[in-house]
UniProtKB/Swiss-Prot annotation:
Transmembrane segments: none annotated. GO terms for molecular function: histidine phosphotransfer kinase activity; protein histidine kinase binding. InterPro entries: AHP1-5/YPD1 (IPR045871), HPT_dom_sf (IPR036641), Sig_transdc_His_kin_Hpt_dom (IPR008207). Residues 97-106 have a biased composition (Low complexity). The modification Phosphohistidine is found at residue 221. One of its GO terms (biological process) is positive regulation of p38MAPK cascade. Keywords: Phosphoprotein. Pfam families: Hpt. Binds to the msc4 response regulator which is part of a multistep phosphorelay system that transmits oxidative stress signals to the spc1 MAPK cascade. This is Multistep phosphorelay regulator 1. GO terms for cellular component: cytoplasm; cytosol; nucleus. It comes from Schizosaccharomyces pombe (strain 972 / ATCC 24843) (Fission yeast). Residues 182-284 form the HPt domain. Residues 89-110 are annotated as: Disordered.
Length: 295
């Protein structure tokens, strides 16, 4: 009975792992398709003849996207993809990703149709063949390295579109510890956070200049934790991103980044986002205490 049960568990585990791997693959393809569209690469890959892959290869190759003599950070496709950091504000990107990943029959190979991602100006179905990002990567339109960058950038809208600067379910727990209407206790915690955050952001800049990835990861982890205590949602997310980049991982920690050069470049771009989110959080909290103080 024990052997039978163990075999059943092993079979279940394998089936579960296969389903998870399939879902992850589908999500990655959808993320890549969305990101390619948002960066304009999918648009350039469109072929009037209906033959997307060779056409895309010629176009991207002609633009220098596959020029291996170029540093990856100077690659036109890389520049197009990473320009989305803190700049892409399309309202329908999250829904697009959800639509792309939904409803794939189990056991089938996922092919992501990017035709629905193209602007209405080009919505001629005959000219918009379904094309999987896997095929684009396989054909040399995007290198494996660039596919990792595209995967990572596909999370950008989640951070930008999140309107929740502060999670009040967390912050209000801190306020409940105040003994008076002056909020002296919570205010001391918040003011201490301001000092810590400003010092840490300055240290992050120094670590970036020194190209110290280990230090960058550690500082990102520290600021993520202190931001989480106050319920500063956006600060927590962007600091977690820096923590993972410093460990040579994608922002969600799933994929390995191609090089230290890429990690440092992504951290550099993310630091400007940290500064913006910190200023927003600081202004919000100062205003909150000004309005909610009895004096």
């Amino acid at each position: 009975m024990s052997v039978y049960r163990d075999n059943m568990y092993m079979k279940y585990d394998r089936n579960f792992e296969n389903r998870v791997a399939r879902r992850n693959g589908q999500a990655r393809n959808a993320s890549l398709a969305k990101t390619l569209h948002d960066s304009g690469i999918a648009e350039r890959a469109r072929s009037p003849s209906g033959s997307a892959i060779p056409h895309a290869y010629r176009v991207m190759n002609g633009s220098g996207a596959n020029d291996t003599s170029l540093p990856l950070t100077s690659n036109p496709a890389y520049v197009a993809l990473t320009s989305r950091i803190s700049s892409s504000k399309s309202e329908n990107n999250q829904q697009l990703a959800a639509n792309e990943t939904a409803g794939a029959p189990e056991g089938t190979e996922e092919t992501v149709d990017i035709s629905n991602s193209i602007s209405d100006d080009h919505a001629n179905a005959k000219n918009l063949p379904a094309a999987s990002v896997k095929a684009l990567v396989g054909a040399g339109v995007l290198s494996d390295e660039l596919s990792v960058i595209a995967y990572d950038m596909s999370f950008e809208d989640e951070l930008i579109q999140d309107k929740q600067l502060i999670d009040h379910s967390v912050f209000d727990q801190l306020l409940e510890m105040d003994d008076d209407d002056e909020h002296e206790f919570s205010k001391s915690i918040v003011w201490n956070y301001f000092e810590q955050a400003e010092t840490t952001i300055a240290d992050l800049q120094k670590a970036l200049e020194a190209k110290d990835l280990k230090k960058l990861s550690s500082l990102g982890h520290f600021l993520k934790g202190s931001s989480a205590v106050l319920g500063l949602t956006k600060m927590r997310k962007v600091c977690e991103r820096i923590q993972n980049y410093g460990s040579l991982r994608s922002r969600d920690g799933v994929m390995k980044l191609p090089s230290e050069e890429i990690a440092l470049d992504l951290i550099s771009k993310s630091l400007s986002v940290v500064n913006d989110f910190y200023k927003d959080a600081r202004a919000y909290l100062l205003d909150f205490y000004e309005k909610n103080s009895s004096t």
